[in-house]
Amino acid sequence: MPAESTSPAELRAGGCQTRPVQPRRLLLIRHARAAGGPVDLERPLTEQGMRQAAAIGPWLEETGLVPDRVLVSPARRAVQTWEQASAALSSGVQPISEARIHDNTVDALLAAIREAREDVVTLAVVGHNPSVGELAGVLDDGRGDPVARRKVEAGFPAGGVAVFDLAVPLTAVGPGAATLSDFRVPGD
């Protein structure tokens, strides 16, 4: 008979002790409030947007959701959002500029996410609507937090962060493959 401290996963592995698997997470972050402008890629954050973005970092730190990999749209407002958010983080994770995020399609976002390295535990994607909101809607398997789900369905506001727990590797992320565990707009 296995010891009481043997986990179900260890039992399935024939009683062999294994390292606990750290749950993978995906953070979808919509850039904070931005100013208008004639050149989309150059639109900056407003003062309110700067405050919104600055509130994201402390929230990520306090909730233990600091990503170990960040993909950011090359648009100025997305880059500024991550710069402001990351200023409060204890880790020095450097963002990776990902042009496909600015394509603003669910397929482009999924393609970028699926290329994450195998060792990534928490991946953050800083992008734009409508693709961020649409992806949040299709990823959810319906078993997550109902309050968070209602917030996502009501619209994905500027500065919003959707937190998904993944039961699959990032390479297999797709519709219905994640559980929405939280949705916040830090600073609001």
PLM feature spans:
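A glycine-rich beta-strand to alpha-helix segment
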Residues: 120-142
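Active-site-proximal alpha-helix that buttresses catalytic centers in soluble enzyme cores
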Residues: 21-104, 140-146, 156
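Residue-level preference for the first positions of well-ordered beta-strands
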Residues: 26, 122-124, 161
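Short phosphate-binding loop-to-helix
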Residues: 101-118
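Domain-level recognition of soluble alpha/beta enzyme cores
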Residues: 140-179, 185
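Extreme N-terminal basic, low-complexity initiation segments
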Residues: 1-10
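Glycine-rich phosphate-binding loop signature in dinucleotide/nucleotide-binding domains
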Residues: 63-65, 116-121
